[in-house]
């Protein structure tokens, strides 16, 4: 019992003393020489204050919102009714109304519609704003399946990576203050799967064990490399996106987002989640056998 408390205390101290900057972002190897010492010499600068972080976050959000405004302004001239429907969908009715507008202009203004979809999806993912599930369903309605799947996976990977970098830049004070205990527990899991981190990230993206927003903001704090994070996310969101996109082909027959998921699709997702983690399990067993 005492050993367990000591181990947990050690993990907590490590979480505060060795943020993601201790490793080269996007690599899985050791940190660059001198980088670790430099961070330890300036803990206050590394952690930052919650107020400063909030100001930076608001500034970044304002800039991103302005970019979204420019994207919207570059859209073709819309009628009053169409402008009302040009919003982030919150339910299936909103998604249907938005799909109707976008499908009308998709062929004539293909690039503008694609850019608007791309930018909106990444914006929602970056700032952990709900609504991306409806955009995933909408992609199946607007585009051919291969393009829709690639688009959703790319947007999810980029958006989650931007959220990762945002957390790396300004989110650590929030993690330290409000999510330390949960982050420590996940850090222990990450260390156990360090050799198969991509498989583990894929597994987490397929399954609902950890919320996506939690994975995004804590990953840089517990030394998940950005490259591994992006690849794991890009591949991991493919199976659930497959289900959502397939449902989008029958958009106007759906009344809720829950109808996009059947028991059959849940079973398939469970099988894929198991397959994603099997290489790590088998290699661990073989390693134990030969040792």
From Swiss-Prot:
Q: Which residues carry this modification: Phosphothreonine?
A: 18
What residue spans carry the region label VTT domain?
140-251
Signal sequence annotation: none
Annotated GO biological processes are: autophagosome assembly; intracellular lipid transport; modulation by host of viral RNA genome replication; nervous system development
Catalytic activity entry? a 1,2-diacyl-sn-glycero-3-phospho-L-serine(in) = a 1,2-diacyl-sn-glycero-3-phospho-L-serine(out); cholesterol(in) = cholesterol(out); a 1,2-diacyl-sn-glycero-3-phosphocholine(in) = a 1,2-diacyl-sn-glycero-3-phosphocholine(out); a 1,2-diacyl-sn-glycero-3-phosphoethanolamine(in) = a 1,2-diacyl-sn-glycero-3-phosphoethanolamine(out)
**InterPro entries for the chain:** TM41A/B, VTT_dom
The topology of this chain with respect to the membrane is: Multi-pass membrane protein
Ranges for region Disordered: 1-38
- Its main subcellular localisation, reduced to a broad class, is endoplasmic reticulum
Q: Membrane-crossing residues?
A: 52-72, 109-129, 147-169, 197-217, 225-245, 262-282
Q: Does the keyword Phosphoprotein apply?
A: yes
- Basic and acidic residues biased stretches: 1-11
Name where it's found.
Answer: Endoplasmic reticulum membrane; Endomembrane system
Q: Which molecular function terms from Gene Ontology are attached? A: phospholipid scramblase activity
Q: Name one GO cellular component term.
A: endoplasmic reticulum membrane
Pfam families attached to this UniProt entry: VTT_dom
UniProt keyword list: Autophagy, Endoplasmic reticulum, Lipid transport, Membrane, Neurogenesis, Phosphoprotein, Transmembrane, Transmembrane helix, Transport
* Biological role stated in the UniProt entry: Phospholipid scramblase involved in lipid homeostasis and membrane dynamics processes. Has phospholipid scramblase activity toward cholesterol and phosphatidylserine, as well as phosphatidylethanolamine and phosphatidylcholine. Required for autophagosome formation: participates in early stages of autophagosome biogenesis at the endoplasmic reticulum (ER) membrane by reequilibrating the leaflets of the ER as lipids are extracted by ATG2 (ATG2A or ATG2B) to mediate autophagosome assembly.
Similarity annotation: Belongs to the TMEM41 family.
Report quaternary structure and partners: Interacts with VMP1. Interacts with COPA, COPB1, VDAC1 and ERLIN2. Interacts with ATG2A. Interacts with SURF4.
| Domain note | The VTT domain was previously called the SNARE-assoc domain. As there is no evidence that this domain associates with SNARE proteins, it was renamed as VMP1, TMEM41, and TVP38 (VTT) domain.
Name of the protein described by the UniProt record = Transmembrane protein 41B
Organism equals Rattus norvegicus
- In the UniProt record, the gene name given for this protein reads Tmem41b
């Amino acid at each position: 019992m005492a050993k367990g408390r000591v181990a947990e205390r050690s993990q907590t101290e490590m979480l505060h003393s060795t943020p993601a900057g201790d490793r080269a972002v996007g690599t899985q190897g050791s940190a660059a020489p001198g980088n670790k010492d430099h961070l330890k010499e300036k803990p206050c600068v590394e952690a930052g204050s919650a107020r400063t972080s909030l100001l930076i976050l608001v500034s970044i959000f304002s800039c991103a919102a302005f970019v979204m405004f420019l994207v919207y302004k570059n859209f073709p001239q819309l009628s009053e009714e169409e402008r009302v429907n040009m919003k982030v969908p919150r339910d299936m009715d909103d998604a249907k109304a938005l799909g109707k507008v976008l499908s009308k202009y998709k062929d004539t203004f293909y690039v503008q519609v694609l850019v608007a979809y791309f930018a909106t999806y990444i914006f929602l993912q970056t700032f952990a704003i709900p609504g991306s599930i409806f955009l995933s369903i909408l992609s199946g309605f607007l585009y051919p399946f291969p393009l829709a799947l690639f688009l959703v996976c790319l947007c999810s990977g980029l958006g989650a990576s931007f959220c990762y970098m945002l957390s790396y830049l300004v989110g650590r004070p929030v993690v330290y203050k409000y999510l330390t205990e949960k982050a420590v527990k996940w850090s222990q899991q990450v260390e156990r799967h360090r050799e198969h981190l991509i498989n583990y990230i894929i597994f987490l993206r397929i399954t609902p064990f950890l919320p996506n927003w939690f994975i995004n903001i804590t990953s840089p704090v517990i030394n998940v490399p950005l490259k591994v994070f992006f690849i794991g996310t890009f591949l991991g969101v493919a199976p659930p996106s497959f289900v959502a996109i397939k449902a989008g082909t029958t958009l106007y027959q759906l009344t809720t987002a829950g109808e996009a998921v059947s028991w059959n699709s849940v079973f398939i997702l469970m099988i894929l989640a198991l397959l994603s983690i099997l290489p790590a399990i088998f290699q661990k067993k073989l390693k134990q056998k030969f040792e």
